[in-house]
Amino acid sequence: MDSILKIYDVKWTSNTAGPSPDGNRRTEIFIRGCKKAAEGNPCNGCFNPKLWNDTDTAIGRPPREIAEMVDEHAPNKFVTIVGGEPLDQVRPLAELVSWLKFYGFHIILFTHYTLEEIKIATVADEEYGDDYLALFQNVDVLVDGEYDASQRIYDDEAGDGLHDAIGSANQVVWDIRGWRKGDSGTIDGLRAGDLAGLYIC
């Protein structure tokens, strides 16, 4: 059986999903479900509690079909994937980003997991380790870490690709293109609270 990715919605044009040279317009894909929240431990002040449950009204589609739909309807080649928690569906997510990259998209991924946790999973998780590796062959920017309302920096009118996209200062922005070069040591990360803005040229 082909893998299925449970999504909640797709926002074709968002100006609050990260930077792009096209006036910060990006397509935003909302992934359904968050195991952490479902177990009673959501991020403090989570933006999207309606996405915690991965069963009610979930739209399950093959990753290739979702990518084809995005390629057909997106206004440009910039996409952001949020949740819920996207990495709770890492196998179909890895397929989705592979297809999105095939269609030429720049990809930002938000997750409450830290990059260090993900790097450990690539080795320690016998079932999904290869899926984590495959994921990072295609994602361009990772924003990691739990949202913390006490460190909120989000301002949907900021217009800088950072404060109108990232929730709290503790989250880290990683340029993970080094993974595609086979050299994870080249990954650069900066804490969102230490940045003035986020731009893609």
Give, region by region, the residue ranges found by the protein language model.
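Glycine-rich phosphate/diphosphate-binding loops that line cofactor/substrate pockets in enzymes
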Residues: M69-A74
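Charged phosphate-binding loop/patch that engages nucleotide di/tri-phosphates or the phosphate backbone
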Residues: V172-C201
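A generic local structural motif
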Residues: T13-N15, I66-E68, Y128-D130
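Canonical Radical SAM [4Fe-4S] cluster-binding loop centered on the CxxxCxxC motif
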Residues: D2-R61
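Short, acidic Gly/Pro/Ser/Thr-rich loop/turn segments
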Residues: K35-E39, A149, R180-G182
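Alpha-helical scaffolding segments of alpha/beta enzyme cores, especially the outer helices
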Residues: E65-E68, R91-F102, A134
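Residues that form or flank phosphate/diphosphate-binding pockets in enzymes
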Residues: A38, D88-R91
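Core AdoMet radical
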Residues: F47-R61, P75-Q89, Y103-Y128, Y132-S150, ...
